[in-house]
Amino acid sequence: MAARNKARKRAFQILFEADQRGESVQSVLADWVRLSRTDDRQPPVGEFTMELVEGYAQYADRIDDLIVTYAVDWEIDRMPVVDRSILRLGAYELIWMDGTPDAVVIDEAVQLAKEFSTDDSPSFVNGLLARFKDLKPNLRREQ
C-alpha cells in the first residue's frame, strides 16, 4: 500500500474515532501521536496524516456546511459515521489541497468507502465528491 494511501486511511480512522467519541480531531490525533511514541506496536503518525487531519479541523464547519448543502435528502447527523468521515476527509483534500490530482482524491475516498462502508456508499461518496470537484473554484472563493 502506498504511503499516501496509508496516510489517508489513518486520517480517516482518526476522523471516525473523533466522531464516535465526540471529541475533537486534534485531541484524537494527539492521542494517536502519543501512543505511537510509547507503544512499539503502533506505527508512527506520518506528516501527511497530520496535514490531512489538521487541515480538515481548520475547515470543519465549512466542510459540514458543504456536505449538508449538496448531499440531497441527507442530514449529516443521520449519515453513517463512516461515510461522513470519508466525505469530510475527501472534501478537505479535494478543495483545499493541491498536491494530488482530483481524480486520485476521489478514487481514494471511494476505495475507503468500499473497504469500510455499505454497498451503496462508494457511489454516494463518488457522486458528492465529483460535485465538489466541479464546484471547486467557487467553493474555494466562498470561504
Curated annotation (Swiss-Prot):
It comes from the Bacteria. The keyword RNA-binding applies. Keywords: RNA-binding, Transcription, Transcription antitermination, Transcription regulation. Coiled coil: none annotated. GO terms for molecular function: RNA binding. Gene3D superfamilies: NusB-like. Signal peptide: none annotated. GO terms for biological process: DNA-templated transcription termination; transcription antitermination. GO terms for cellular component: cytosol. The keyword Transcription regulation applies. Belongs to the NusB family. Involved in transcription antitermination. Required for transcription of ribosomal RNA (rRNA) genes. Binds specifically to the boxA antiterminator sequence of the ribosomal RNA (rrn) operons. This is Transcription antitermination protein NusB. The lineage of its organism: Bacteria, Bacillati, Actinomycetota, Actinomycetes, Kitasatosporales. The gene is nusB.
